[in-house]
């Protein structure tokens, strides 16, 4: 059988040889463009085992396949030996997409082998090369011959990686509070730099304030859950850290939510008390605040404790071991599957759903993000401006700096472009994540981009990064924006683009880490399955659009208060995102949009998001992250099927020539005329959700009402 490991070092090669029946049962295949490392090549030259070297470019696909069949017919396993290409840290595989695609549509079955290399410490818990603490080799079930065999092999690797990570020493019996205390005391002089008042708080003092806050929480509430209504800043970090230390479930509230959404979240989570800040309640007056008696003003409470108590706890931390300090502070020891926090979905299609996040999920999320970043503890600085009610805000803005030993710079407003640019330049920030609207504000304030030159990673989170914004950042400022794809159910992201690795050795093959239109490769520990639009079964052609399903240690398995039997989005260990996308042979994920944002026209699926971009071009209008000008929805047709409708703020009234403009604009772009909306409806504004995404349900109901279509 054809055996396809994701990566191989000499130790793995020898173990594989044993597992497959010894050297008389194995033939090794080496492809010249991605040859194995020096140790393997020396071993092959010394032992002269059965096998062959080839070059697809020079000898052609047919020749290579004939050599594979020759050894298979002789009763041997043919094992592909991947090389050591340049790519992102902790990548899934060392096999380039073109080499995997070699076996597509052939009569060859394949057995994927996933080789996992792990360390017992946080900074490099997942690695791809020596040295490592432990090696796991998983022989996956054979993949049947046929179309897109290479992409199906990738899917098997991802599932095997998830199974291995579940047994990682850090995740099998995690104690997140203990790890946080140990990490902070290991880097006590790291600082939280507050961008509002330019104050600095050492992590040792931050831990002391969090320990004091655990007592405040216990005094005010005996409930298992507590709400946190705070923006990014030192009080938000202290409150979330205190909840983890106290074993209390933190529910970070979206303070841009509507009153109806806020009431729904409070009832769903069963909240009675909320941690906040006096200044923030005065600033955020439009928010539907709870009664004052239900609010815990953390700034006032800590002020009443006195600075002497803070200094006492800080002094205690200097002379006690982490275990002694935890015992003295009565730090909780929660189980790995105890709920640490609750996030809520954005409510794009329905009311926000509560997502319980366990301690194991949080730690797995931080590990997967840390392993993908080439940052140095003790000198690199992270910018924290994404609110903690978003998974990226909690994981990347709070836990990653604390566990990784990085300074963090906080600021409460993600769209304060001028101030954020100044903070990035002042503190030489290396990592920043922001929403597309916040990024646009930063680029506008940056002028020539030099103030952002220290950024090694500039991630776009929260909503889709427009091609126009990404290209403008690259062309005008020389800044690569890294698109990510996330959901509230998968922490911190499902996938993220990464910068290309430095290439001092130009002869080494470089695997893609980002591509226009893609959201990058799935993070370590996230398995992606592409299915049909109406079935949870894996697609035989994952490189064609289908529903995106996920599983992994940082992916939820349930919703708050909803059994899995009542949720069509949960199927075994898999979670359905409701998004449509596909995987490329080189492991990059493309997300096309929500399932509801596609219209079925015969055999064709028309993506609304892509159609909206085309309509903006037809009307020569620039997209605005803060105010939508148009939206496309799908409504039932009176003759059966579906019809496309364009809601437009660009029209006060619609005349027949408007339909011709759209129709000719679509066909001039070599698209079918069926892409032209059947109806154009003038509206005063396009409804959006607090997270900035389209309020599709309101748009749909409004379109049906205007067209007098009755809904069940």
In which residue ranges do the predicted regions lie?
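Conserved pre-ATP/AMP-binding loop-to-beta segment of ANL
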Residues: 188, 231, 296, 304, ...
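A cross-family acyltransferase "interaction/gating" segment
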Residues: 41-42, 76-80, 84-148
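AMP-binding/adenylate-forming catalytic core of the ANL superfamily
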Residues: 432, 552, 557-558, 573, ...
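Conserved ATP/PPi-binding loop(s) of AMP-dependent carboxylate-activating enzymes
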Residues: 518-525, 533-568, 604-607
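Conserved AMP-binding/adenylation subdomain of ANL enzymes
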Residues: 363-381, 391-430, 445
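Conserved C-terminal "lid"/linker of ANL adenylate-forming enzymes
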Residues: 599, 633-634, 645-647, 662-712
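Gly/Ser/Thr-rich phosphate-binding loop
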Residues: 15-16, 308-320, 429-434, 443-513, ...
């Amino acid at each position: 059988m054809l055996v396809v490991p994701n990566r191989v070092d000499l130790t793995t090669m020898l173990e594989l040889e044993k597992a497959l029946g010894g050297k008389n049962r194995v033939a090794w295949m080496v492809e010249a463009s991605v040859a194995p490392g020096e140790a393997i090549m020396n071993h092959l030259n010394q032992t002269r085992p059965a096998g062959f070297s080839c070059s697809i470019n020079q000898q052609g696909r047919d020749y290579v396949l004939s050599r594979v069949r020759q050894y298979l017919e002789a009763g041997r396993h043919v094992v592909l030996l991947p090389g050591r290409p340049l790519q992102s840290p902790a990548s899934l595989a060392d096999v380039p997409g073109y080499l995997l695609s070699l076996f597509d549509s052939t009569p060859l079955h394949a057995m994927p082998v996933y080789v996992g290399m792990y360390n017992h410490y946080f900074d490099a818990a997942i690695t791809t090369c020596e040295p490592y603490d432990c090696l796991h080799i998983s022989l996956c079930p054979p993949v049947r011959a046929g179309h897109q065999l290479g992409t199906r092999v990738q899917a098997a690797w991802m599932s095997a990686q998830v199974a291995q990570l579940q047994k990682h020493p850090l995740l099998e019996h995690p104690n997140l509070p203990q790890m946080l205390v140990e990490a902070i005391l290991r880097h006590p002089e790291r600082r939280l730099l507050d961008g509002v008042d330019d104050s600095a708080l050492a992590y040792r003092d931050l831990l002391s304030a969090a320990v004091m806050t655990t007592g405040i929480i216990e005094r005010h509430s005996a409930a298992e859950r507590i709400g946190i209504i705070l923006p990014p800043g030192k009080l938000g970090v202290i409150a979330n850290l205190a909840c983890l230390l106290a074993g209390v479930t933190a529910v970070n509230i979206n303070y841009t939510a509507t009153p109806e959404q806020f009431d729904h979240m409070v009832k769903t989570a069963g909240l009675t008390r909320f941690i906040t800040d006096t200044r923030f309640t005065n600033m955020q007056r439009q928010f539907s605040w709870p009664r004052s008696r239900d609010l815990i003003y953390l700034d006032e409470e800590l002020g009443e404790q006195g600075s002497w108590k803070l200094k006492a706890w800080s002094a205690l931390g200097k002379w006690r071991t982490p275990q002694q300090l935890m015992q003295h502070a009565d730090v909780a020891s929660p189980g790995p599957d105890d709920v640490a926090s609750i996030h809520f979905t954005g409510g794009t299609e329905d009311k926000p759903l509560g997502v319980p996040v366990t301690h194991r999920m949080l730690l797995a999320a931080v590990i997967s993000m840390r392993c993908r970043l080439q940052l140095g503890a003790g000198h690199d600085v992270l910018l924290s401006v994404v609110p903690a009610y978003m998974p990226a805000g909690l994981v990347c803005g709070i836990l990653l700096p604390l566990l990784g030993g990085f300074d963090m710079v906080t600021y409460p407003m993600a769209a304060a472009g001028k101030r954020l640019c100044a903070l990035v330049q002042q503190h030489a920030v290396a990592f920043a994540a922001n929403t597309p609207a916040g990024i646009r504000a930063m680029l506008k304030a940056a002028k020539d981009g030099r103030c952002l030159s220290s950024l090694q990673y500039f991630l776009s989170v929260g909503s889709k990064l427009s091609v126009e914004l990404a290209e403008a950042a690259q062309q005008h400022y020389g800044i690569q924006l890294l698109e990510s794809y996330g959901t509230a159910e998968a922490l911190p992201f499902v996938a993220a683009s990464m910068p290309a690795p430095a290439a001092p050795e130009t002869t080494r093959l470089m695997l893609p880490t980002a591509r226009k239109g893609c959201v990058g490769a799935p993070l370590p520990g996230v398995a992606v399955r592409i299915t049909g639009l109406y079935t949870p079964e894996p697609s035989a052609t994952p490189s064609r659009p289908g529903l995106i399903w996920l599983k992994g240690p940082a992916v939820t398995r349930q919703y708050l208060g909803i059994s899995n039997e009542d949720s069509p989005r949960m199927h075994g260990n898999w979670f359905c995102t409701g998004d449509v996308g596909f995987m490329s042979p080189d492991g990059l994920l493309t997300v096309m949009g929500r399932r509801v944002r596609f219209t079925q026209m015969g055999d064709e699926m028309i993506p609304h998001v892509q159609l909206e971009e085309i309509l903006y071009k037809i009307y020569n209008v620039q997209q605005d992250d803060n105010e939508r000008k148009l939206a496309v929805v799908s409504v039932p047709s009176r003759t059966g099927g579906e019809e496309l409708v364009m809601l437009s703020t660009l029209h006060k009234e619609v005349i027949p020539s408007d339909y011709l403009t759209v129709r000719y604009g679509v066909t001039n772009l070599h698209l079918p005329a069926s892409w032209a909306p059947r109806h154009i409806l003038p509206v005063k504004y396009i409804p959006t959700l607090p997270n900035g995404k389209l309020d599709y349900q309101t748009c749909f109901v409004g379109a049906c009402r205007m067209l007098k279509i009755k809904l069940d």
